[in-house]
């Protein structure tokens, strides 16, 4: 898993793009140039309410004050955003910057790491322009530590993009989820994940990934998945109550093996997120102390209770399931994907009723970057209130990314990551899909004609 010359070349490509005329803009806020953002409304995340009007005072990359009115220092630039709602930048806790729509296996086999890295920079920009100022990239899917180059280019101001937590490749067992198991063995097709078959190998892999720049760990805990109805594997349910459908996603690591990974990540000052669709893998993950259970299609009563007690968020990723159902290659595949979505919705409602903590993660990449605000709409459609979904995005998302004291609120001392949307998102959650203004770290990246700069 050594950093290859291809990855080093990708770093150079990203740097070149960042310095190209017309590509970069000023990406460092001037602390001597205060900015006051003014809008008709402001979303107070902690209180879970809209206040009117709304103002945010920004100096440098940080918020100085926020509320219905703030001090206007001498010489401050006032940006009047009119009939909009000021909100913290959105957080997507599950993205894939190195993927785009189309067959994933073909991307990882046919596209070079430099090509995928360039595409990842474009994906990062699209996500930022959609209002996502912080993201957790859940694996490069075969591009190794190339995400380190993208993160450093963003942090260095070379290219626009969200604040990132990155994992490099995810970790999986030999022959497990994301391994190249459908190819002619003579072709020696590389896995999209890094192999680790026991606790010792998990720890070793985490250390090597950390050396190459990863800032959290992703582990595949379950897969592949199957949905069974009427005792007929592979036959999608077409009627009846999902309560009686049989979903199966075998675990890959024991609780002890996962715990070894969690302990090593903790020693390094980071955490572990798991791809987990079913039981008993979800219980093993919760017992091991992971930071999140992503997809979380099936959770037992015991697992849900443990997640509540330890405040381990589930990350449902509805948008990718809906996208696959709507873009299936055949009628049979569409029926299967719609059945999977129906089962997932049924289980999600159980989880919400049980009080399982939620975070917002879309799994964007296989569907177009910059469109993932749809995830918040779907979580509302399937059972949560707009306030609950927004607080899940901001508070639990910030917790997962371990930036809970820096992002997710319009509060003094937090990063000046601010967006504005038309209307009131508590009345209509789809407003988050119409972001009109984006500021990250005190720098304005997007401003549509909704107000005036003074």
What are these regions (language model features)?
Residues 121-145, 161-170, 214-224, 271, ...:
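Divalent metal-dependent hydrolysis catalytic cores, especially in the metallo-beta-lactamase
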Residues 7-19:
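Bacterial N-terminal signal peptides
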Residues 102-104, 147, 228-230, 282-289, ...:
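Histidine/acidic-residue-rich catalytic or RNA/ligand-binding cores of hydrolases
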Residues 85-158, 174-177, 182, 288:
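Metal-associated gating/positioning segment near the N- to mid-region
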Residues 267-271, 340-425:
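His/Asp/Glu-enriched, well-ordered alpha-helical/loop segment
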Residues 26-33, 42, 47-87:
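Histidine-rich, glycine-flanked metal-binding segment
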Residues 149, 200-314, 338-357:
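Histidine/acidic residue-rich metal-binding segments in metalloenzymes
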Residues 98-116, 174-190, 225-251, 310-341:
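Active-site gating loops and adjacent loop-to-helix segments of metal-dependent hydrolytic enzymes
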């Amino acid at each position: 898993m050594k950093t290859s010359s291809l990855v080093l070349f990708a770093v150079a490509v990203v740097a070149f793009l960042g310095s190209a005329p017309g590509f970069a803009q000023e990406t460092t806020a001037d602390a001597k140039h205060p900015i006051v953002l003014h809008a008709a409304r402001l979303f107070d995340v902690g209180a879970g309410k809209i206040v009117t009007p709304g103002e945010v005072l920004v100096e440098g990359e940080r918020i100085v004050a926020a509320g219905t009115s703030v001090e206007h220092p001498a010489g401050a630039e006032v940006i009047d955003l009119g009939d909009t709602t000021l909100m913290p930048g959105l957080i997507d806790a599950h993205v894939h910057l190195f993927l785009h729509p189309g067959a994933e296996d073909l991307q990882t086999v046919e596209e070079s790491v430099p090509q995928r890295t360039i595409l990842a920079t474009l994906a990062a920009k699209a996500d930022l322009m959609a209002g996502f100022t912080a993201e957790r990239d859940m694996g490069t899917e075969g591009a190794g530590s190339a995400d380190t180059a993208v993160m450093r280019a963003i942090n260095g101001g070379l290219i626009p993009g969200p604040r990132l937590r990155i994992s490099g490749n995810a970790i999986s067992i030999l022959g497990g989820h994301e391994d190249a198991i459908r190819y002619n063995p003579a072709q020696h097709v590389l896995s999209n994940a890094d192999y680790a078959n026991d606790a010792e190998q998990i720890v070793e892999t985490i250390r090597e990934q950390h050396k190459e720049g990863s800032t959290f760990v992703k582990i595949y805990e379950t897969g592949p998945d199957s949905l069974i109805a009427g005792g007929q594997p592979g036959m999608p349910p077409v009627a009846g109550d999902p309560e009686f459908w049989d979903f199966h996603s075998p675990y890959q690591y024991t609780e002890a093996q996962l715990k070894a990974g969690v302990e090593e990540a903790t020693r390094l000052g980071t955490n572990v997120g798991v791809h987990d669709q079913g039981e008993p893998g979800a219980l093993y993950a919760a017992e091991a102390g992971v930071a999140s259970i992503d997809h979380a299609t099936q959770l037992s009563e015991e697992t849900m209770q443990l997640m509540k007690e330890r405040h381990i968020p589930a990350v449902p990723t509805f948008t990718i399931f809906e996208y696959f159902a709507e873009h299936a290659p055949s009628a049979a595949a569409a029926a299967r994907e719609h059945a999977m979505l129906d089962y997932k919705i049924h289980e999600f409602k159980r989880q919400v009723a049980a009080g399982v903590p939620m975070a917002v993660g879309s799994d964007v990449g296989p569907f177009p970057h910059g469109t993932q605000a749809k995830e918040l709409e779907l979580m509302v459609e399937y059972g949560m209130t707009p306030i609950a979904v927004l607080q899940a995005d901001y508070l639990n998302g910030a917790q997962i990314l371990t930036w809970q004291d820096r992002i997710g609120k319009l509060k003094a001392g937090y990063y000046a990551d601010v967006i504005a949307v038309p209307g009131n998102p508590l009345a209509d959650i789809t407003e988050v899909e119409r972001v009109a203004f984006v500021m990250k770290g005190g720098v304005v990246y997007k401003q549509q004609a909704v107000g005036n700069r003074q």
